[in-house]
């Protein structure tokens, strides 16, 4: 499928929505070595996602899950079940911080991960990726009243930049702006708290994530776009991770993503979860990882 451009404005965050047949788990039994498709056929799938990212992966006060990654994962699992003639399985959610994603997959603690999981060459050495299912770009979150930061270059004045352990955005900034001081936390929500308290000067990660926080704490923060030589600072392709060399599972995920685009579900989920106020999000081309050749 050729890449299709879908434009969405990230704004209102989808309210808490109870998901039928979905439960949360801190650990949970794994279907491990049986493979991703076997887990679906057996009726229980452990899915990793974020618990603290509004509009993408969020555990709500009533313990239901909401967000684009949550909805995409649920669609993929159930679409594969429908295609195979199986019953829809129970989905058990597992929190998957950035630094733990590969380990959770390799240890069989989850069957798949949809957690703002940017595909890159290093990660592809240890896990398989279905997708990509969207393309976003790196940006900055700063305090609303802080006028020191309007461009990427403004960080190169000894300012403190926050990101999450195991994620790549902050190091990419450090590579081009050596004067930046890095501060890492385990979760983006911890970075947001540090930013609000003035302990860091900016948070960097994907624009999709940052607009979710900007909307959740409306009036407290603003998003600053990042460019290099007039182009987006980075391209971030989100994929669905599963065990290395599970090609059958990978192919099934890609086919489900194609169905999600074709029936209009992806555009609907974008609008429901991320609203219509800012930032361009582009559909991915499932199975096309040619961008890794340039990384």
From Swiss-Prot:
GO terms for cellular component: extracellular region; outer membrane-bounded periplasmic space; plasma membrane. It is found in: Cell membrane. A lipid is attached at residue 27 (S-diacylglycerol cysteine). Pfam families: SBP_bac_3. The keyword Transport applies. Binding of glutamate or asparatate induces a higher thermal stability of the protein structure. Disruption phenotype: Deletion of the gluABCD cluster almost abolishes glutamate uptake activity. It is a lipid-anchor. Residues 1-26 form the signal peptide. Its main location: membrane. Keywords: Amino-acid transport, Cell membrane, Lipoprotein, Membrane, Palmitate, Signal, Transport. A lipid is attached at residue 27 (N-palmitoyl cysteine). GO terms for biological process: amino acid transport. SUPFAM superfamilies: Periplasmic binding protein-like II (SSF53850). InterPro entries: Bact_solute-bind_prot3, SBP_3_CS, Solute-binding_3/MltF_N. Part of the ABC transporter complex GluABCD involved in glutamate uptake. Binds glutamate with a high affinity. Also binds aspartate with high affinity, suggesting that GluB could be involved in the transport of both amino acid residues into the cell. The complex is composed of two ATP-binding proteins (GluA), two transmembrane proteins (GluC and GluD) and a solute-binding protein (GluB). Belongs to the bacterial solute-binding protein 3 family. This is Glutamate-binding protein GluB. It comes from Corynebacterium glutamicum (strain ATCC 13032 / DSM 20300 / JCM 1318 / BCRC 11384 / CCUG 27702 / LMG 3730 / NBRC 12168 / NCIMB 10025 / NRRL B-2784 / 534).
């Amino acid at each position: 499928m050729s890449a299709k451009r879908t434009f969405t404005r990230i704004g209102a965050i989808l309210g808490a929505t109870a998901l039928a047949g979905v439960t949360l788990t801190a650990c949970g039994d794994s279907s491990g070595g049986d493979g991703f498709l076997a887990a679906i056929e057996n009726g229980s799938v452990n899915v990793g996602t974020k618990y603290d990212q509004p509009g993408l992966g969020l555990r709500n006060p009533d313990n239901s899950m909401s967000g684009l990654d949550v909805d995409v994962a649920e669609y993929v699992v159930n679409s594969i079940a429908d295609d195979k003639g199986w019953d829809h399985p129970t989905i058990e959610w597992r929190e998957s911080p950035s630094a733990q994603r590969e380990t959770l997959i390799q240890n069989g603690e989850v069957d798949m991960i949809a957690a703002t999981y940017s595909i890159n060459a290093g990660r592809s050495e240890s896990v398989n990726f279905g997708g990509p299912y969207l393309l976003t770009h790196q940006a900055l979150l700063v305090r609303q009243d802080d006028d020191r930061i309007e461009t990427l270059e403004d960080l190169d004045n000894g300012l403190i930049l926050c990101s999450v352990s195991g994620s790549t955005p902050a190091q990419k900034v450090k590579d081009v702006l050596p004067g930046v001081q890095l501060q890492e936390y385990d979760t983006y929500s911890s970075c947001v708290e540090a930013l609000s308290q003035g302990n860091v000067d900016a948070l960097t990660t994907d624009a999709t994530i940052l607009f979710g926080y900007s909307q959740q704490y409306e009036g407290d923060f603003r998003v600053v776009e990042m460019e290099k030589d007039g182009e987006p600072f980075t391209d971030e392709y989100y994929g669905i991770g599963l065990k290395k060399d599970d090609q059958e599972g990978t192919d099934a995920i890609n086919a489900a993503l194609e169905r999600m685009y074709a029936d209009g579900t992806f555009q609907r989920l974008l609008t429901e979860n991320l609203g219509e106020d800012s930032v361009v999000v582009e559909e991915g081309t499932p199975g096309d990882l040619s961008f890794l050749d340039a990384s």
